[in-house]
C-alpha cells in the first residue's frame, strides 16, 4: 500500500488541464488545445443532442415516451 502523506486542496478539482494540445509554429505560434472542461462540454452537448433526436416525435399526434420525458424536463426547468 502506498504512503498517502500529501493533502490535496479541494480547489484542485477545478483546475483546467490540457488533455490534447497542438503547437503549430508555422502559423505564427498557433496553439490549440482540448481541456478537461472542453471535453465535458462536448460530452454534454453530444448527450443532449442524442436525447433530442430520440425524443423527436416526427409530427405524430400521440407523443412517445421519449417525447413525454423531454417535455417533462422542459417544464421542470422552464
UniProtKB/Swiss-Prot annotation:
Its main location: mitochondrion. The chain crosses the membrane at residues 34-54. GO terms for cellular component: mitochondrial inner membrane; proton-transporting ATP synthase complex. Keywords: ATP synthesis, CF(0), Hydrogen ion transport, Ion transport, Membrane, Mitochondrion, Mitochondrion inner membrane, Transmembrane, Transmembrane helix, Transport. The keyword Mitochondrion applies. One of its GO terms (molecular function) is proton-transporting ATP synthase activity, rotational mechanism. It is a multi-pass membrane protein. It is found in: Mitochondrion inner membrane. The keyword Disulfide bond does not apply. InterPro entries: ATP_synth_F0_asu_bact/mt. Belongs to the ATPase A chain family. Mitochondrial membrane ATP synthase (F(1)F(0) ATP synthase or Complex V) produces ATP from ADP in the presence of a proton gradient across the membrane which is generated by electron transport complexes of the respiratory chain. F-type ATPases consist of two structural domains, F(1) - containing the extramembraneous catalytic core and F(0) - containing the membrane proton channel, linked together by a central stalk and a peripheral stalk. During catalysis, ATP synthesis in the catalytic domain of F(1) is coupled via a rotary mechanism of the central stalk subunits to proton translocation. F-type ATPases have 2 components, CF(1) - the catalytic core - and CF(0) - the membrane proton channel. CF(1) has five subunits: alpha(3), beta(3), gamma(1), delta(1), epsilon(1). CF(0) has three main subunits: a, b and c. This is ATP synthase subunit a. It comes from Aspergillus amstelodami. The lineage of its organism: Eukaryota, Fungi, Dikarya, Ascomycota, Pezizomycotina. The gene is atp6.
Amino acid at each position: 500500500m502506498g504512503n498517502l502523506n500529501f493533502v490535496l486542496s479541494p480547489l484542485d478539482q477545478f483546475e483546467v488541464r490540457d488533455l490534447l494540445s497542438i503547437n503549430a509554429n508555422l502559423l505564427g505560434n498557433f496553439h490549440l488545445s482540448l481541456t478537461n472542461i472542453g471535453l465535458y462540454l462536448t460530452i454534454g452537448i453530444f448527450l443532449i443532442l442524442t436525447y433530442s433526436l430520440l425524443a423527436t416525435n416526427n409530427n405524430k399526434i400521440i407523443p412517445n415516451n421519449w417525447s413525454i420525458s423531454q417535455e417533462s424536463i422542459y417544464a421542470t426547468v422552464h
